[in-house]
């Protein structure tokens, strides 16, 4: 469960971009954050992901304060799908999906066959099996976004943002 209570954020000494934002999302629920450009939707999600620190309020994940959670546990339980295409250096699609397991693949341990089997199965489920070995640089924006969603889901997170 994700719970945001009276969240507020602003850059530096500037006025708060948003304040008093509260919501709760339970397991199995979906939440859409809507609003005009520049109102702070992405910034709020970046705060939830701990890329930015709130100026006020609290974020809890499964009842624990997010800012006090162990970093390894936090990243094990949560996956994030960015909204913009990132530089990917021509990785094959399947490798991009396997990178979602990076917390499980430590230095000295390369991805295993079962990691790739999971990635191929997920790509098939998303209708992307035919492009699994294609370079990410050749994908449309929509295809690439689906690859990023598959990468986020491969580790079975409790929360997908």
Predicted regions and their residues:
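Conserved structural motif at the start of ABC-family nucleotide-binding domains
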Residues: 2, 16-20
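Helix-to-loop junction immediately C-terminal to a conserved catalytic motif
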Residues: 49
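Conserved ABC ATPase signature
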Residues: 110, 135-139, 143
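Conserved catalytic motifs of ABC-family nucleotide-binding domains
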Residues: 156
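Conserved ABC ATPase "signature" region
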Residues: 98, 113-131
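Conserved ABC transporter NBD signature motif
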Residues: 57-67, 74
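The feature captures the beta-strand-to-loop junction immediately N-terminal to the Walker
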Residues: 34-36
């Amino acid at each position: 469960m994700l719970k945001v209570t009276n969240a507020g954020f602003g850059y530096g000494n500037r006025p708060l971009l948003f304040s008093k934002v509260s919501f709760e999302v339970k397991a199995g629920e979906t939440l859409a954050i809507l609003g005009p450009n520049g109102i702070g939707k992405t910034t709020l999600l970046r705060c939830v992901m701990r890329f930015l620190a709130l100026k006020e309020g609290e974020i809890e994940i499964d009842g624990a304060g997010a800012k006090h959670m162990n970093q390894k546990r936090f990243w094990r339980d949560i996956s994030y799908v960015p909204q913009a295409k990132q530089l990917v250096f021509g990785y094959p699609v399947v490798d991009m999906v396997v990178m979602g397991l990076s917390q499980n693949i430590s230095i000295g341990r390369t991805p295993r066959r079962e990691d790739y089997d999971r990635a191929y199965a997920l790509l098939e489920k998303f209708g992307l099996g035919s492009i699994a070995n294609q370079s990410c640089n050749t994908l449309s924006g929509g295809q690439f976004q689906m690859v990023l969603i598959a990468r986020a889901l491969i580790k079975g997170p409790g929360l997908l943002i």
